[in-house]
């Protein structure tokens, strides 16, 4: 079986059925105070050849006029409490709401479709019936500095490729890389592997991609389907982001067991970044080195978060609501009675052993 198949012209040709499939495609965009992006986002979506009722906005109780703008555009809208947003559960709710769709495209509010065929090109990957998911290219914004530009060029090259479970021998965990900033899923494949994990802090798309690869679906990187999407993250924001990724990996050990770690990919990234900065902006090398060290430390901290009090995790993480919910769950699990002064650690319960931890079906344990 081919492990990772590049496509030399940078695209996977969409067949003549793409137009029909486009009409059976739902587009899901979670929003929160998206008004500042709206004009450009709506204009770009208008060029994609999809009708307004194919676009589903899941709004986390924005305090600006996001919902008013979405209603004016004719989009479907569902409002949820801000604190109830979860990366996996919210996207799964959207998938179940769009029961008519054969393909679901997920975007973020700040991902701007590039060109007029990016969605059609993305779903062109599904002309191969063995493809379960596809994700598109992310281009850096015009004002991005060299560090930000390199991150996008490294992770989203100009050449498409197809990944299978065998790709892990060459790519490690990168074989399951996906980004819901611009990704598409065959609904039947998504539901076959259990949908999006409902209780995950981040990386719900990586979990789904990994499950699909294990189930012998293919995952495609579609380079000719692009959005403009990059962020000028501060060091503190990156620290929180990589802490959360570490938490996800620490709580999803099956993922690392099945695909391996990311250490080799990390070394390749650092070498590539150094060469890019030497050529484009050497003055950024010291701050890039510090950022890389910070990301490594925060990832390792997240990987071993079980040793940290929840209050510390709340302070570090980007997703306070995740830890607040976990705190409530653990408090509810306290014994009804106990000795005065008895202390309970607000930490996850020990893993079950033996028959108790065996999944009831092949994907139940892949959380």
What residues fall within each predicted segment?
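Short, well-formed alpha-helical segments that are part of the catalytic scaffolds
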Residues: 33-47
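Non-catalytic, C-terminal membrane-associated alpha-helical segments of glycosyltransferases
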Residues: 244-247, 258-367
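A short, conserved alpha-helix in the catalytic core of glycosyltransferases
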Residues: 183-185, 189-194, 199-226, 232
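A conserved acidic beta->alpha catalytic loop
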Residues: 59-67, 112
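Short, flexible, basic/aromatic active-site loop/helix in glycosyltransferases
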Residues: 136, 154-175
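Short beta-strand-to-loop acidic/aromatic patch adjacent to the donor-nucleotide binding site
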Residues: 101-112
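Glycine-rich, basic loop-to-helix element that forms the pyrophosphate-binding segment
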Residues: 81-99
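Conserved donor NDP-sugar-binding/catalytic core segment of glycosyltransferases
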Residues: 112, 116-148
């Amino acid at each position: 079986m081919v492990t990772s198949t590049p496509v030399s012209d940078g695209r996977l040709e969409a067949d003549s059925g793409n137009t029909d499939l486009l009409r059976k495609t739902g587009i899901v965009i979670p929003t929160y105070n998206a008004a500042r992006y709206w004009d450009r986002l709506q204009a770009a979506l208008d060029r994609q050849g999809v009708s307004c009722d194919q676009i589903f906005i899941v709004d986390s109780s924005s305090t600006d006029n996001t919902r008013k703008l979405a209603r004016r555009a004719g989009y479907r809208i569902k409002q949820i409490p801000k604190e109830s947003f979860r990366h996996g559960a919210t996207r799964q709710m959207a998938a179940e709401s769009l029961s008519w769709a054969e393909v679901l495209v997920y975007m973020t509010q700040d991902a701007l479709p590039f060109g007029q065929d990016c969605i059609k090109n993305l779903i062109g990957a599904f002309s191969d019936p063995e493809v379960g998911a596809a994700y598109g290219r992310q281009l850096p914004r015009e004002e991005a500095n060299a560090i930000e530009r390199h991150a996008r060029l490294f992770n989203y090259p100009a050449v498409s490729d197809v990944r299978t479970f065998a790709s892990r021998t060459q790519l490690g965990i990168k074989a399951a890389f996906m980004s819901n900033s611009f990704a598409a899923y065959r609904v039947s494949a998504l539901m076959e592997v259990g949908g999006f994990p409902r209780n995950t802090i981040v990386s719900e798309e990586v979990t789904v991609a990994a499950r699909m690869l294990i189930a012998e679906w293919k995952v495609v990187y579609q380079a000719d389907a692009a959005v403009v999407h990059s962020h000028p993250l501060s060091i503190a924001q990156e620290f929180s982001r990589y802490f959360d990724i570490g938490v996800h990996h620490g709580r999803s050990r099956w993922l690392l067991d099945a695909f391996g770690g990311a250490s080799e990919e990390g070394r390749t990234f650092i070498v590539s970044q150094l060469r890019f900065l030497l050529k484009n902006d050497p003055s950024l090398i010291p701050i890039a080195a510090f950022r890389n060290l910070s990301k490594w430390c925060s990832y390792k901290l997240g990987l071993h978060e079980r040793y940290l009090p929840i209050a510390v995790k709340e302070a570090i993480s980007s997703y306070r609501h995740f830890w607040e919910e976990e705190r409530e769950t653990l408090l509810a699990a306290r014994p009804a009675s106990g000795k005065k002064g008895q202390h309970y650690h607000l930490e996850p319960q020990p893993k079950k052993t033996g028959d108790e931890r065996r999944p009831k079906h092949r994907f139940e344990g892949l959380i």
